[in-house]
Amino acid sequence: MKIDVKKMKLDLLLGALGALLMVVGDLSLSIIHSDNSDRGLYVREAYMNGSYQLWRPVLLFATGLIGMFFYSFGIKAMIDQIDPKCRKLRAIMKYGGLAYICTGAALHFFIGTLSYWMTVFSAEFGRETAIRLVDDYYSRFMPAASIAYPFIALLLLGSFISIVSNRTILPRKMLLFNILSWQLILVLVPDIHQMISTNITTMDYVMSQSSGNQAAVIMFVSQFIWLTRNEKKFEQ
């Protein structure tokens, strides 16, 4: 299978940059003081006591828009790694990736607005009213925002299956660095910690809220390194 190694390496680097920018946005939500009363995405003490800075969701919005643009290059690299003979698989990845790029930034921003409204409403109307208003906002808009999740699933499963079935340029050992593998790890670790301990830590939020984007950074960077080490094989 012939590939343009230099172009794919560039696409992987740009994809890693995009995912890293998305992580920055995730961290703007999760790197705050944790409290035992925290629950879910937005009922957090730091939002309600006024210590959360409102420039953070703005940063999330900006890095999300730019990040999804660069992320698209990483998705292109994922598609280009698949054998051209596997047209259906490539089509699934292509259209799933296109839909994710279109919806991912909106979902990212929506999650960010939860912190903004909880902070503003708590200051204006008090905690109980703020929780009630944001609960209503979340229940109304989350079903629509969830449109992004099936496309994310297509990308994750498509990438994993393509390597398992040996339909890409990547060896099966690269499953160790696949986005699905690492996302599961980053989600399960805080879940296991919360089963063992009742205390929710900031690190639990960091790992769970940015799991998908951290996993993407790991995957894109590891594939770049693997491609660099095996570059001569594709030049022959």
How would you name each of these model-derived features?
Residues 1-236:
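Hydrophobic, aromatic-enriched alpha-helical segments typical of multi-pass transmembrane helices
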